[in-house]
Amino acid sequence: MALLTRIRGPRDLDRLTPAQLAELAEEIRAFLVEEVSKTGGHLGPNLGVVELTLAMHRVFDSPRDRILFDTGHQSYVHKLLTGRQDFSRLKMKGGLSGYPSRAESEHDVIENSHASTVLGYADGLAKANKIQGHKDRPVVAVIGDGALTGGMAWEALNNIADSQDLPIVIVVNDNERSYSPTIGGLANHLATLRTTQGYERFLSWGKDALQRTPVVGQAMFDTLHGAKKGLKDFIAPQGMFEDLGLKYLGPIDGHDLQALESAFTKARNFGGPVIVHCITEKGRGYHAAENNDEDRFHAVGVIHPDTGLPVKTSGKDWTSVFGEEMVALGRERRDLVAITAAMLHPVGLAPFAKAYPERIFDVGIAEQHAAVCAAGLATNGLHPVVAVYATFLNRAFDQVLMDVALHKLGVTFVLDRAGVTGTDGASHNGMWDMSILQVVPGLRLAAPRDAEQVRLQLREAVEVADAPTVVRYSKGNVGPAVPAVGTVGGMDVLRRPEADSADEAADVLIVSIGAMAPTCLEAAELLAQQGISSTVVDPRWVKPVDAALPGLAAQHRLVVTVEDNGRAGGVGSAIAQALRDADVDVPLRDFGIPQEFLDHASRGEILDEIGLTAPAIAKKIEALVSTRSFARS
């Protein structure tokens, strides 16, 4: 790593020879494999953008020239070149974020890791530069890995194309999974011509001259313009961009430093919005990634660097339980279809796709469309299951509300990675869904506590034909089964009060939501050791509030809700409202995630920090019960 350790900032790259740059690229790849294999992270995308990132930082002057990464998971090389080479605690508490982070460096402009947003940022930044008199400062937006399938990206492109004087360089990182590259001498030649200002001036003059020519001028211009457009669309994929009025350069070999620097220099000097289309290879230089047909090691856990195999085999996770049950349901119900938003493998739908390829729809990074497409499928008598990460459902809220719920359609939304997910940081914690979905009329929301409940509640959800249903579960391994000892209404009783308190009101009713069940049971045991009796129930379906819950609450001195969701507007708030509506005057305390953007750390570390552990919950309950307001009479 002789060269890499000498790089403290982007300008250190200027002194390197072409041979040294090639050597540095290999050092960076070796570093990424060695370090990310120890911590886990987005390995494949970063191996594919080494030369691209080197070229950008040699041509553009960051942070004066803003360099933005859509989604941000391909920013590891950018971090290395901007003074951040300690990857020993990548994505861990106190270590580097797995995404750009403004707290880490002035070179990081944005840190939202939801896809398809970067072009909107670029549009706004460039317009601000113009207003502030900084028109000479280009904004560079790197977008790829399917993010151009998102509608937001095209909304931004439409606006960027309307501002021809904004120096925006849009780098399309095409890793051969979103586009079919067209590479050839003629295409490269035309692309070079189209990004020179002289060519633009010539085109403008020719257009005006032809259109001023009497009788035949306009017809000749239309003919020539049509021929140019037809030839352009035939030989290269720039047509879809140039039809918007955006200039296009490419395709460029994304691993040829000289070609990349030449293209970026032309784009920088053009003075208006330019598309630079770069063909890259995801996982480049690492045999295990290159031979992985599934996703080229898009994201990995801790692996053996030599083989790419996991260091340890994990147990069954929530996602695979869902995937298995979907396959079983598919055998039983021919009307069952599935939708994913570019996350076929991560959300567990790959087995369903293999078994029933005609009943799976991958709509790209387009959660809004996924919801409306599901509405259309349901309208025609099918039952769609839309599987997304919980944090990404935020993007489709209007469609859930107005296109599914308003029409009383039987659509099931399955929310993976619900609650605190940890190492991917603030944008990936699924802590908003149970709050925003509380306001949707008719929607029913399930929070399974274990694998058995995932299977049961998924089956219950797809039986509902006249309203949207939601099933949400956590990330990672699913724990042991948590058996019920009884039922009250539609709720499972997980623990009853001790025998010596059977003839009087128990102290505490603990309402456990989803994966918090083991924590709540442990807290109840700690309370029992202090002489505080408790009942623990799992509502299973947390929206609407079970009709039996107010009556059960009335038999206790204190009600406590514990949820892996933001406290504001969550299940605790809904239960409090239900108690008020039923005139049940029992104090309620809700435990949940504070309404904050939580830094990256492990799930356990975050739960400990915010007080969602059994000892912390028990201690707070003990303090509440010991006050005069809750003392035994």
From Swiss-Prot:
It catalyses: D-glyceraldehyde 3-phosphate + pyruvate + H(+) = 1-deoxy-D-xylulose 5-phosphate + CO2. Thiamine diphosphate binds at residues 73, 113-115, 146-147, 175, 286, 367. One of its GO terms (cellular component) is cytosol. Pathway: Metabolic intermediate biosynthesis; 1-deoxy-D-xylulose 5-phosphate biosynthesis; 1-deoxy-D-xylulose 5-phosphate from D-glyceraldehyde 3-phosphate and pyruvate: step 1/1. Its EC number is 2.2.1.7. One of its GO terms (molecular function) is thiamine pyrophosphate binding. The keyword Transferase applies. InterPro entries: Dxylulose-5-P_synthase (IPR005477), THDP-binding (IPR029061), Transketo_C/PFOR_II (IPR009014), Transketolase-like_Pyr-bd (IPR005475), Transketolase_BS (IPR020826), Transketolase_C (IPR033248), Transketolase_CS (IPR049557). GO terms for biological process: 1-deoxy-D-xylulose 5-phosphate biosynthetic process; isopentenyl diphosphate biosynthetic process, methylerythritol 4-phosphate pathway; terpenoid biosynthetic process; thiamine biosynthetic process. Binds 1 Mg(2+) ion per subunit. Mg(2+) binds at residues 145, 175. Pfam families: DXP_synthase_N, Transket_pyr, Transketolase_C. The keyword Transferase applies. Keywords: Isoprene biosynthesis, Magnesium, Metal-binding, Thiamine biosynthesis, Thiamine pyrophosphate, Transferase. Its cofactor is Mg(2+); thiamine diphosphate. Catalyzes the acyloin condensation reaction between C atoms 2 and 3 of pyruvate and glyceraldehyde 3-phosphate to yield 1-deoxy-D-xylulose-5-phosphate (DXP). Homodimer. PANTHER family: 1-D-DEOXYXYLULOSE 5-PHOSPHATE SYNTHASE-RELATED, 1-DEOXY-D-XYLULOSE-5-PHOSPHATE SYNTHASE, CHLOROPLASTIC. Belongs to the transketolase family. DXPS subfamily. This is 1-deoxy-D-xylulose-5-phosphate synthase 2. It comes from Kitasatospora griseola.
